Each structure stands twice: as C-alpha cells, then as structure tokens.
C-alpha cells in the first residue's frame, strides 16, 4: 500500500470510507477516537451515513471541544480535496431540507446510489424502516436520552474494568441481546433492506442506524445481496473502508493510530458558536 504524506504526516489511502451514528453532542460520542481515525486516513470519498450530529440532544448545551474538532477535521478534509457525502439520518433530520445541495466537495443527500468497480451500491441511513421514528417521535427521543445515560454509565464501568485488567463490556448490547423484540427488530431491519436491494438489482446495501456493525450475504428466493452496516462511534467505534476491490469492517481498537490529534489543525474553536463562524467562512471561501 502506498501511503500519502502531508505536512510530515503519513496517512493511509482509502478509496471510500463510511462512518455513521457518531452522535456529536451526546455524552456517549467517542469524538477523540473518531478525530484520530479521520486524521489517519486519506480517503477519496468520505460518506457520513446519518446521525453525525445529534440535533435532538443539542438543546442540553453539551458540545465539548473534542466534538468541535471532529467537525473541524471534516472541514480540513474537504479543503484537502476529499469528497464528502453527508447522508441524513433521524437524529439530524433537520438537514433533510438541504438534500440535493452541492457546495464544493460537500454533497448532502438522503440516500446514495453509487457504482464502485461495476457494482451497484445502495447507501442510506436506515431510519426509514423504523416505525417508532415516524409515529412516536417523542418516545424515540425519550429512549435516546436513556440510551445516552446508559452509554455514559457503561464508560465508567469499562474504566473500572480496565483498572482491574478485565475486558470491556457493552451494557447496551447485553440489554438488546436479552430483549427478544430488539433482536427481532435488527433481524427484520436487515432482511427488509436486503429484500428491497435484491428487488432493485443492487449488489450491496449499506446502512447505519441500528449500531450493529456487520458484513454478510443475505439470500432470499429472489437472489442475494451483500449487506453492510458501518456501526457507530458510541459503542463499537467502527466504520467501513473500500480498497483494492473489497470492503473491510474496521474497528478503531484494532488500528495502530498515533494519539496526537491536533497538531495539524490551525485553530481549535472553544465553542459551537465559534465553530459556526468558522464553517461560514469556509463556505463563503468555497462560493467565492
């Protein structure tokens, strides 16, 4: 593999990288780890597949510097020539009003049909299959807040386990695995996505939303399709990468990544307001 060197930093080249369910603005978001991951790669195309910003949670005024640095990192990637496609999800659905917008290297869409090396890829967040989002949004938001606190508690538990030399655990996964309805929902989600993809002649269907990273073949009586889910940056810290004709599911904890995050960022905004001003300047520069 030929590595890309920029300003004394060696980055790993990636043809396509996909991340989803980052949930910036929540306590559970692993923003520092995501910043490190994004800094380590030089993708031709970065697809952000929904729930990058958790607009539902922004009202609580929690948006630390580590979260603003992730946004700043994406802006830097745009400036360096990476094409970024932002696919909207249910937690950032307010951005759907901008679907179809193209501004420099940034595109906002609700779904993406992509041909990669002759294979048809159908990429979307996945909340379209979630009935609770469409009919009981207040209940979904309440559940999201409970999930946020569960993840925060899980972090404290894993910190103690690390001090004891024990392996980390996922409390939310244990809860989901113990609830038959949750297991059935994941199975139905995957099956529905696969059936629609097969009916439309797609080779791959790629989703996020359910925080279940996986790559597998799903077969029906009408054919088969490759189902991929990029996972999340709350529990699993996972993403998808396409290189050399194949997809890989990457796990942050399996990567050997430098822990120095910010020496290549010119400035670090100290508030979301300062970040908004920086984004506005970036967009004005692109328009000019």
Located regions from the model:
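Core catalytic region of metal-dependent phosphoesterases/phosphodiesterases
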Residues: 3, 10-15, 26-116
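Short, basic, glycine/proline-bearing loop/turn elements
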Residues: 15-23, 55-60, 174-181
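Residue-level marker for buried hydrophobic side chains located in beta-strands
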Residues: 16-18, 46-48, 122, 206
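Active-site glycine-centered loops adjacent to acidic/histidine catalytic or metal-binding residues
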Residues: 21, 50-51, 89, 125, ...
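Conserved beta-sheet core of the metallophosphoesterase superfamily
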Residues: 104-109, 122, 127, 131-141, ...
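Non-catalytic terminal accessory segments
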Residues: 108, 117, 171-203, 212-213, ...
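Binuclear metal-dependent phosphoesterase catalytic core
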Residues: 114-117, 218, 223-288
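Active-site-proximal loop/helix segment associated with metal-binding centers of metalloenzymes
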Residues: 124-189
